[in-house]
Amino acid sequence: MFMKRVLIISYYWPPTGGSGVQRWVKFAKYLPSEGWQPVIYTPENPEQLAVDASLEAEVPAVAEVLKRRIVEPYELYKKVLRRSGHSKEAVEVNPVNAQNKSMLQKIAMWVRGNLFRPDPRCLWIGPSVRYLKKYLAEHPVDLIVSTGPPQSMHMIGLRLAQETGLPWIADFRDPWTKIFYFKHLQMTRATERWHKKMEKKVLDGATAVVAVSPLVQQEFQTMTQTPVELITNGFDECDFHAEPFAMAYGGPAIDFCITHTGLFAADGNPTVLWDVLSEKCKADAEFRKHLKINLIGKTDEQILKAICDAGLEENLMNMGYLEHARAIDEQRKASLLILPLRKEPEYKAVLPGKLFEYLASWRPVLGIGQTDGAMSMILQDTKAGIVLEWEDKDAMRRYVDECWEKHLKGELKATEGDISRFSRINLTRRMAQLFDRLTAHP
């Protein structure tokens, strides 16, 4: 079967784990069935906060994977922190995410914000463009896709499109200058102007732009004449092929599992929820006996401390990073899935990747964040759960009580609406249709 070829420039690729990997691994998995051969360009030695070798099985045999070494400033940063006596946890946390920054971390933030533009992967831009120009001369493709962050991937895509004349899609998994941590990077005014100029250059230079959230799509469309498409993240039906766990619907002899999967950052710590659970445990011995707080993925130590300080240490199960399939199993066994957003105004526009796998788990979802944000719209539309403000203690108590009562009766179900539009197969079909439009000959 003849297939067109698409070059996908992505920093994240298996065996690296995490949500940043899964979007384009899943697209690559299903693109061949839509007539497209994926050619992935990715670093040989990326920074890996999580490793999930199981994702390598998702990459189709027809895919071509090109790997080149990258200079990683974060490795030098970690060595300096270790030598200065920082804890293992502090060393592993990106300085952007560190809450109580040491002087060394503050210096690292300034260096990262002003000397590495647009991000610490900028040292890969020039070598990548030179390598890919030579590669494409010998192995032509029909289309280029860059996916960011890191935004350096878009800089590679921009220069490559300019020098080859190929159509190019800039896929934004997160915004650029409107991402929550942008304002924390301690940039000079000149650096901030440079970022806004380059963001505009990428948006205008792309043949098409893809956003994963409707609010980000709208924001980008006000900034450029380039068409901005909405193609969200999603769930892979193959990951959910087994029958739902019967125990997940509850019963008086079954544990009441409140589960969070993925990165759990300190600035998304739902302290009010821990207070609600603590008070209910004190008032209801049966609830205390059956409550399990399951945390899967990288969890900030401040969150673990907050849970223990609330008297919930015996109920806590900190499982760490699990392979994707095991994480999904735990989601499906949950009584309640929690999705606290970071306490940043920019998160109103965010649709976390885990949201869609939460939907496919058919469990009730308690979101904590802006009640008028993008995530709230999805949960309302699918009737899969609710989003409450961070400090709305009474509403959280009522929702936990409601889920607990349904759990005891074995009636705990969720996601009544249609979620088929979020399946990876349907999303890949839409992406392939965009590919076809951009490469159609007049």
Provide a role label for each language-model segment.
Residues 207, 315-317, 331-348:
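Acidic donor-binding loop of glycosyltransferase active sites
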Residues 290-297, 302-328:
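Nucleotide-activated donor-binding/catalytic signature segment of Leloir-type glycosyltransferases, i.e.
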Residues 74-79, 235-254:
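Acidic anion/phosphate-binding donor-loop and adjacent secondary structure
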